[in-house]
A protein has these predicted regions:
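Conserved catalytic core of nucleotide polymerization and phosphodiester-bond processing enzymes
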Residues: 1-301
């Protein structure tokens, strides 16, 4: 009802929604959206898909969505320089299955759906500074097994362990963290005398460089590069960015320019990180999935 009841009343006379987007609307540096908040429309539920089907392209146009694939884990690989993670992404393999192989001690063909699901929880949990108790709850297991997964993860990926520790130590010493591009986020609570406030700040600090780099800095640089490249190609007026949802960019494209626009925007997003920030480190490929269709709820790759 949040969307079904309120969105129709917010449609302007031109048949469009003119939502507000705030460039620094979150502490991580990500965009936020309001009036209405189009970033919170569900995608996995059938109702969410039906709501998205109501967002249609004008006559003569298509909606084309570009979505970064596993961007936070790719950035984690880049910033930690973990050799296993980097190789998995270079080989084009699934990172959650690859981590499951290590954590559960199985071969590639032996990874079950449940193992991959658990590895995904562990991957994001560790990167978000999740402790053993939180892992236990999210995995639906007991503390002993959660502790085993936690310890095994750090034993298998010592480079990631040392990277996360260095981030936390830096934040404790300086009171802030930095993204790959040097954007700072301050954590006044990290020196608090109140234990739970200090612990919360430490958890947030662990993930801040990764999340800030991935879902804020890179997406914005990709957006700017796409605009510049579309302008150079002379089709900027026929390719309009209409929505940004975290890792996803949605464009309204004149049908005759869809193919060209996809190549330009996909390339801009894949090469969003300027080369000077990759000097002396092993790069990690950024991958983008593309879907197009007449409405936002039915986009085909």
């Amino acid at each position: 009802s949040t969307y079904i009841d309120t969105i129709p009343a917010q449609v302007s006379a031109d048949g469009r929604l003119h939502a507000h987007f705030i460039q620094a609307g979150t502490t991580t540096g990500r965009f936020s959206s309001s009036n209405p908040n189009l970033q919170n429309i569900p995608i996995k539920s059938e109702r969410g898909k039906n709501i998205r089907r109501a967002f249609i392209a004008p006559e003569g146009c298509m909606l084309v969505a570009f979505d970064y694939s596993q961007i936070e884990l790719r950035v984690a690989a880049l910033m930690s320089q973990d050799p296993y993670f980097i190789q998995v992404f270079k080989d084009g393999k699934d990172i959650h299955s690859a981590v499951a192989m290590k954590v559960f001690g199985v071969k590639e063909g032996e990874v079950t759906h449940d193992m991959r699901r658990r590895a995904k929880v562990i991957n994001f949990g560790i990167l978000y500074g999740m402790g053993v108790n939180a892992l236990r709850q999210n995995l639906g297991t007991d503390r002993k097994e959660a502790q085993l997964f936690h310890d095994n993860y750090f034993a298998q990926f010592p480079t990631i362990a040392s990277y996360l520790e260095s981030i936390q130590n830096f934040a404790k010493e300086h009171g802030y963290t930095e993204t790959l591009f040097g954007r700072k986020r301050y954590f006044p609570g990290i020196r608090s005398s109140v234990p739970f406030i200090r612990a919360m700040a430490e958890r947030m600090a662990i993930n801040a460089p990764i999340q800030g780099t991935a879902t804020a800095d890179i997406i914005k640089i990709g957006m700017k590069r796409a605009v510049d490249d579309l302008d150079k190609a002379g089709i900027l007026g026929d390719v309009n960015l209409v929505l940004q949802v975290h890792d996803e960019l949605v464009y309204e494209v004149k049908k005759e320019h869809v193919g060209e626009a996809i190549k330009i925007i996909e390339n801009a997003m894949k090469h969003a990180i300027p080369s000077e920030f990759l000097a002396n480190i092993e790069p990690v490929p950024l991958e983008v999935s593309v879907g197009e269709g007449a409405n936002w709820g039915e986009l085909k790759e």
